[in-house]
């Protein structure tokens, strides 16, 4: 069956693979065919050889060879195009007004900024801040405010700084500052994570504004204004410095952060935190390859106090084109670190931010486009929006939602929030938090995160069902028993997953802290939980958690209340989770493509260990009945000898006594030995290093398995095409004989014979061979004649008498008990085999 269409719909948030080479094989119930260029959804990387994929969400998964495919970039549904009202398609001039307000209270404190960003000592203005729409505006002090208008000319999306540089009018300058002696020019430029556009046609270095004089982080995120002082055309450097009403803003030359060259310090979704050579932190997006000095806004818990805004009407807005370029941070309050009202926020298994509606259970994912703008798309890929949908809920629904989230507010200890700047905020859970729905969102570095006003309004941690400190140990993993090792771990219950980290550290959850990656995760779907018996642990307050993957945990706490709460919450979570069928379990993993590419027959596999699901407890009466039936079965079970006598069990070929094997096959030479010798003489006499080169042990074991189970063996099959596999199996047959071809009781006699004079050696060895059992004599004769033919083709295969003797000496001749004379015995073993090969006609006749 053909698997995928090249033009299939790309589902957002999925990981896809692309086929690089054609491949086909026979599965258990169908024929798998993949073609070059086809794409599939990656379900699981099972091992290094095979990956599990499926054509679409509703199809059955199957396996493809990992070497034949490649993983492609994760696709996401592109955001809808936002048209700006009145924006012409052709090149026209669009005037913008950036309204900068200042307070007259500090008119005598404004600093003078030269064109090189060095402060003078004249006057000082109020600092710029951002409102909820990420627009620049001044801090709000009571007093008279004056608008300073900057006219910007836009041409084909680029700012022209020749003839249309934004000018500060003399009238406005005189009214605002009173003593500015000449025209000033300010260029406002857009920057993004991935590129910086130059506004200076004269080639002067760009200089960025710093928002925080203490942190020194640049405004390098998307939709950020970059303000620079330039000289108008045909004029020299201005006689007087350029002034603007900006407070505590730094202008410095800076480049993009370097590419990461070391592992990430911290990972949050697709964003990684790194340090450069000077120890300064910067941020890198794995998906979009964006780099920035400033923490991404959508990942931070930015909060403000009540006093930051006295009047919402004082917020200054950018013009329509300004909003067009800065849509990524001007849409919803969910970008401030807390989800919008009516939505709950969590991370999915791939680290994406997932929003679930509290009213409709609809799921939406957040993504960032190539320009750094945030948008949202539904989990099924049918819709994409710049903002999350808004629902009008009744007061009763809101009360139920608030009640369901009340678990997080019962914490007795203070909550510690970790900021991106690694400073902390301690919240007292007994304090009443004022509503924050109407509060605008600010960058974190607008005010010190450790200031007292943040303690009242900082957002609470991400919604979680339960978390706390527990003692935990594994007693089984993947169905195998492991040694108990009790550890104190910080446990976090997230949906159907129970996560464990080392310690609480500086966060109430494993998100946002330095230990953001959990030590291990437990899937609660299909799990069982019960109080542990005394034979499992001597500790008190211990319960046992078993997963359907075969992992067994013991969880303990000295506090009775804590352990009872955890037991109730986990029991409730397990009961509410539906057990999903794993299609990958039912699908049999095929053999390695490089070895058995054309295999048309499936090898007989060992029975799989089926996963048991504990659906309901068994009554004690049923348990007694089961034990009784098992006892009856064991007592009536026939012995192994009786089964062999009836012919139900047959001895295997490998490891069987040579005489018994020949008797069972009604001959004096094993059929497998004849089969291997005939195949080698037909196909392998001219192979370089025949018998000296080892074959693939895994394939040799498969051949051994086929021989032992009386399967129809065809050595011409493509899966046995490697001649060294055949020779390796033949050597293994003689090596695994219970008694070697030269029997134990004659070993010392053969050693004494080889020590005699050269003329007497041949006769002594010949007499000893005649004393061996008939199957040993005949098998030895056919084997040595075959090895002699191999040596006769030595010009092609480069095998000599000595090299063959080294290979077969220890295999055919060995003492019953190894002693300290192993090296001496090896010399004699090789000499005996070499003598028989040289004197073959004298010993066995022609």
Curated annotation (Swiss-Prot):
Residues at the site labelled Arginine finger? 692
Q: Name one GO cellular component term.
A: glutamatergic synapse
Tell me which UniProt keywords the record has, alphabetically.
Answer: GTPase activation, Phosphoprotein, Repeat, SH3 domain
Biased segments, Basic and acidic residues type: 594-609
Question: Which terms does the UniProt entry file under GO BP?
Answer: actin filament organization; morphogenesis of an epithelial sheet; negative regulation of small GTPase mediated signal transduction; phagocytosis, engulfment; regulation of postsynapse assembly; small GTPase-mediated signal transduction
Entry-annotated residues carrying Phosphothreonine:
230-231
Compositionally biased region (Polar residues): 152-175, 191-200, 224-234, 445-461
What's this protein's function?
GTPase activator for the Rho-type GTPases by converting them to an inactive GDP-bound state.
Please name the source species.
Homo sapiens
Output the Gene Ontology terms for molecular function.
GTPase activator activity
**Where, if anywhere, are coiled coils annotated?**
none
- Where Phosphoserine occurs, the residues are 165, 176, 201, 213, 215, 240, 592
**Residue stretches making up the SH3 domain:** 12-74
Record protein name field: Rho GTPase-activating protein 12
Phosphotyrosine is found on: 243
Q: Which Pfam families match?
A: PH, RhoGAP, SH3-WW_linker, SH3_1, WW
Q: Where is the Rho-GAP domain?
A: 656-844
């Amino acid at each position: 069956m053909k698997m995928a269409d090249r033009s299939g719909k790309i589902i957002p948030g999925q990981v896809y693979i692309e086929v690089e080479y054609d491949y086909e094989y026979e599965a258990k119930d169908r024929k798998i065919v993949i073609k070059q260029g086809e794409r599939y959804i990656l379900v699981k990387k099972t091992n290094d050889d095979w990956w599990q994929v499926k054509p679409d969400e509703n199809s059955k998964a199957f396996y493809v060879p990992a070497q034949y495919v490649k993983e492609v970039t994760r696709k996401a549904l592109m955001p809808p195009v936002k048209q700006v009202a009145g924006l012409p398609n052709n090149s026209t001039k669009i005037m913008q007004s950036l309204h900068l307000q200042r307070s007259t209270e500090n008119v005598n404190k404004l600093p003078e900024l030269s064109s090189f960003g060095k402060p003078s000592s004249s006057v000082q203005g109020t600092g710029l801040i951002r409102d909820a729409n990420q627009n620049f505006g001044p801090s709000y002090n009571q007093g008279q405010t004056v608008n300073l208008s900057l006219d910007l000319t836009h041409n084909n999306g680029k700012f022209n700084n020749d003839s249309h540089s934004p000018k500060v009018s003399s009238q406005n300058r005189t009214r605002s500052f009173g003593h500015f002696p000449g025209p000033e020019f300010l260029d406002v430029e857009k920057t993004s994570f991935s590129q910086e556009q130059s506004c200076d046609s004269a080639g002067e270095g760009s200089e960025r504004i710093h928002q925080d004089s203490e942190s020194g982080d640049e405004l390098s995120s998307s939709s950020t204004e970059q303000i620079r002082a330039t000289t108008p055309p045909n004029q020299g450097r201005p006689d007087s410095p350029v002034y603007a009403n900006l407070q505590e803003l730094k202008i410095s030359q800076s480049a993009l952060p370097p590419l990461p060259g070391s592992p990430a310090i911290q990972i949050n979704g697709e964003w990684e935190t790194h340090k450069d050579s000077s120890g300064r932190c910067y941020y890198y997006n794995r998906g979009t390859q964006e780099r920035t000095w400033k923490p991404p806004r959508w990942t931070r818990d930015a909060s403000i106090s009540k006093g930051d805004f006295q009047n919402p009407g004082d917020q200054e807005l950018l013009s329509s084109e300004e909003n067009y370029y800065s849509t990524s941070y001007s849409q919803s309050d969910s970008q401030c670190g807390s989800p919008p009202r009516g939505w709950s926020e969590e991370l999915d298994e791939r680290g994406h931010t997932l929003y679930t509606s509290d009213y409709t259970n609809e799921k939406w994912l957040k993504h960032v486009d190539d320009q750094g703008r945030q948008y949202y798309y539904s989990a099924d890929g049918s819709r994409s929006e710049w903002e999350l949908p808004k629902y009008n809920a009744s007061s009763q629904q809101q009360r139920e939602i608030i009640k369901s989230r009340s678990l997080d507010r019962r914490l007795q200890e203070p909550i510690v929030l970790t900021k991106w700047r690694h400073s902390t905020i301690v919240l007292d859970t007994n304090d009443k938090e004022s509503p924050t729905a109407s509060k605008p969102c600010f960058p974190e570095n607008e005010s010190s995160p450790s200031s007292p006003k943040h303690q009242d309004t900082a957002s609470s941690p991400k919604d979680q069902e339960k978390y706390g400190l527990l003692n935990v140990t594994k007693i089984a993993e993947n169905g195998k028993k492991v040694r108990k090792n009790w550890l104190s771990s910080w446990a976090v219950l997230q949906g159907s997953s129970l996560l464990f980290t080392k310690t609480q550290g500086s966060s109430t959850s494993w998100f946002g802290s330095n230990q953001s990656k959990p030590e291990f995760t437990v899937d609660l779907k299909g799990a069982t939980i019960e109080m542990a018996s005394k034979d499992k642990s001597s500790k008190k307050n211990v319960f046992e958690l078993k997963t359907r993957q075969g992992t067994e945990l013991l969880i303990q706490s000295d506090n009775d209340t804590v352990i009872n709460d955890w037991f109730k919450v986990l029991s409730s979570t397990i009961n509410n989770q539906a057990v999903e069928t794993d299609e990958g379990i039912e699908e049999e993993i095929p053999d390695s493509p490089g070895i058995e590419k054309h295999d048309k027959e499936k090898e007989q596999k060992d029975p799989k260990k089926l996963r048991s699901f504990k659906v309901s407890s068994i009554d004690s009466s049923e348990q007694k009945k089961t034990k009784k039936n098992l006892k009856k079965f064991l007592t009536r079970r026939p012995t192994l000898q009786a089964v062999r006598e009836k012919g139900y069990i047959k001895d295997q070929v490998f490891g069987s006594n040579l005489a018994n094997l020949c008797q069972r096959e009604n001959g004096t030479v094993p059929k497998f030995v004849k089969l291997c010798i005939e195949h080698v003489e037909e196909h392998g006499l001219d192979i370089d290093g025949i018998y000296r080169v080892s074959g693939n042990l895994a394939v040799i074991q498969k051949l051994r398995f086929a021989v032992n189970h009386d399967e129809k063996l065809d050595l011409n099959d493509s899966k046995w095409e490697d001649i060294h596999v055949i020779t390796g199996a033949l050597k293994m047959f003689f090596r695994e004989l219970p008694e070697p071809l030269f029997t134990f009781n004659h070993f010392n006699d053969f050693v004494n014979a080889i020590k005699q004079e050269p003329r007497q050696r041949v006769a002594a060895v010949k007499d000893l061979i005649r004393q061996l059992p008939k199957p040993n004599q005949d098998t030895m004769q056919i084997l040595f004649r075959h090895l002699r033919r191999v040596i006769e083709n030595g010009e092609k295969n480069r095998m000599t008498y000595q090299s063959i003797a080294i290979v077969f000496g220890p295999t055919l001749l060995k003492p019953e008990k190894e002693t300290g004379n192993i090296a001496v015995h090896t010399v004699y073993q090789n000499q005996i085999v070499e003598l028989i090969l040289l004197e073959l006609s004298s010993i066995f006749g022609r």
